[in-house]
């Protein structure tokens, strides 16, 4: 098998293994389960990975990508309709909750916790990029929108972990209120009107 095909197949296997971990749980999933899910002979997964640890960490990174792409994909598609955007984020959080719980199980694991931290740090470093991009869309400063981005991320994370709307709704409603204010201010600016003296 060529290296390109091996790399492509490895990506496919990571996605399948992540689904398997999400379904069965981190500690209950065996290498045999992963091989079966990936349609490999027993032990065949080690042609693509050296150790189970490597598989787990690759799946954790894939989980981060799924959650990040799911959330920010909605934001940049729907930010012109903030009410709809927030509703869709809630639906996405429902869907991604099992994936987030797998990720949390990796993060709190004695075996993998320290080793997954670099992937989490890379994610955190991208928040400033998203903040600037959202600020540009809303025609405001990054400083104005940054607390709202972090509040929304916190709300989504809490909801995906605990599946409790009572934790999620107040935070999301607070973020939505301020985002709507910024969107309305942008609209007034574009119309040449600054009601109430706000700039």
Please provide the spans of the model-predicted regions:
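Short, basic, alpha-helical segments at the C-terminal edge of helix-turn-helix-like DNA-binding modules
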Residues: 61-67
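Helical hydrophobic small-molecule/effector-binding pocket
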Residues: 82-108, 113-114, 188
């Amino acid at each position: 098998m060529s290296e390109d095909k091996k790399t492509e197949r490895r990506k496919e296997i990571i996605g399948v293994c992540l689904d398997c971990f999400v379904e069965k749980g981190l500690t209950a999933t065996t290498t045999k389960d992963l091989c079966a899910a990936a349609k490999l002979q027993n032990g065949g997964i080690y042609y693509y990975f050296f150790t189970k640890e490597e598989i787990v960490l690759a799946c954790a990174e894939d989980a981060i990508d799924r959650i990040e792409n799911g959330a920010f994909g909605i934001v940049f598609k729907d930010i012109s309709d903030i009410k709809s955007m927030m509703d869709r984020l809630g639906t996405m959080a429902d869907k991604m909750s099992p994936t987030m719980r797998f990720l949390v199980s990796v993060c709190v694991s004695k075996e993998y916790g320290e080793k997954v931290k670099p992937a989490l740090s890379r994610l955190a470093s991208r928040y400033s990029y998203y903040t600037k991009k959202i600020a540009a869309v809303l025609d405001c400063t990054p400083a104005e929108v940054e607390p709202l981005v972090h509040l929304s991320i916190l709300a989504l994370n809490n909801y995906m972990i605990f599946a409790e709307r009572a934790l999620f709704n107040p935070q999301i409603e607070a973020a939505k209120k301020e985002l709507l204010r910024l969107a309305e201010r942008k609209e007034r600016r574009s119309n040449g009107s600054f009601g109430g003296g706000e700039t």
